[in-house]
C-alpha cells in the first residue's frame, strides 16, 4: 500500500471520528423537554442550511459554474422527496421510536450520510493531487467541520428519545461514506474530480429539502415556539457560517 493511500485512509478515519465528537455531549443530556427538542430541530436545520450554502453550493459554483450545482440540487431534492414519500407508506421502526419519529430520524441520517460522500471525494482528490499539504489542510478542515455536523445528526435523534451513545454511533455512521469515497477518489483522482460540483449540489439539495419539509415544520407549533425556533435556527446558521469562514471546505 502506498504512503499516499495510507495517508488518505488515516485522514478519512480522523474525519469520521470527528463527527462522533459532535454527538458526545448528548451522552450527558438526561432529559430533553419538548421546548428544547423543538429548538434542537431548528438549530440542526440552521446548521444544515449553512453547511449547504457555504461548504457545498458556493464551492461548487466557484469550481464549475452554476449549472452542475443546480442540477445536483434538483436531483438531490427529488431523491429526498421520493424517499420521504416511500417512508411515509412504510411501518418503519428505528431505535425503538414511534413510526413518525422513526421516519424523521431515518431521513436525517440518510441526508447527512449523502452529504458525507462529496467530502470523502474531496479528501481523496486532495491527497491524490500529490500535495500532502493540501491533503492535511483538507483533513483538518473537514474534521472541524464534522463536529457541528455530528451535533446536527444527534440533536433531532436525542430529542426523540435515542440514547446518547447511540447518537454518537449514528453520527459516526453518517460520516462513514467519507472513508468509502476517499479511497477510490484517491486512486482515480482525474475521474472523480469533475464529479465534485454535481455531488456538492446533490448533497445540498437533499439537506435543504429535509430542512424545509421536516425540520422547520417540526420546530414550530405555537407562536412562542416559532420565535424561539427562529432564534435557535439563526444561531445554528451563524455558528456554521462563522466556522466555514475560518475553515473553508
Model segments located where?
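Intrinsically disordered, metal-sensing/regulatory segments
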Residues: 1-249
Amino acid at each position: 500500500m502506498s504512503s499516499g493511500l495510507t495517508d488518505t485512509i488515516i485522514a478519512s478515519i480522523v474525519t469520521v471520528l470527528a463527527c462522533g465528537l459532535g454527538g458526545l455531549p448528548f451522552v450527558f443530556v438526561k432529559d430533553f423537554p419538548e421546548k428544547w427538542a423543538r429548538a434542537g430541530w431548528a438549530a440542526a436545520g440552521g446548521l444544515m442550511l449553512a453547511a449547504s450554502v457555504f461548504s457545498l453550493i458556493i464551492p461548487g459554483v466557484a469550481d464549475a459554474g452554476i449549472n452542475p450545482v443546480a442540477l445536483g440540487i434538483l436531483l438531490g431534492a427529488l431523491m429526498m422527496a421520493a424517499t420521504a414519500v416511500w417512508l411515509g407508506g412504510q411501518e418503519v421502526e428505528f431505535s425503538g421510536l414511534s413510526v413518525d419519529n422513526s421516519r424523521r430520524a431515518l431521513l436525517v441520517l440518510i441526508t447527512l450520510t449523502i452529504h458525507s460522500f462529496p467530502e470523502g471525494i474531496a479528501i481523496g482528490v486532495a491527497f491524490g493531487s500529490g500535495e500532502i499539504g493540501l491533503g492535511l489542510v483538507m483533513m483538518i478542515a473537514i474534521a472541524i467541520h464534522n463536529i457541528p455536523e455530528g451535533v446536527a445528526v444527534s440533536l433531532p435523534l436525542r430529542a426523540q428519545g435515542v440514547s446518547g451513545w447511540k447518537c454518537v454511533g449514528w453520527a459516526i455512521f453518517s460520516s462513514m461514506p467519507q472513508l468509502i469515497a476517499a479511497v477510490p477518489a484517491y486512486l482515480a483522482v482525474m475521474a472523480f474530480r469533475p464529479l465534485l460540483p454535481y455531488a456538492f449540489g446533490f448533497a445540498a439539495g437533499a439537506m435543504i429539502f429535509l430542512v424545509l419539509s421536516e425540520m422547520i415544520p417540526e420546530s414550530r407549533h405555537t407562536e412562542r415556539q416559532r420565535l424561539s425556533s427562529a432564534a435557535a435556527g439563526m444561531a445554528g446558521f451563524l455558528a456554521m457560517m462563522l466556522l466555514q469562514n475560518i475553515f473553508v471546505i
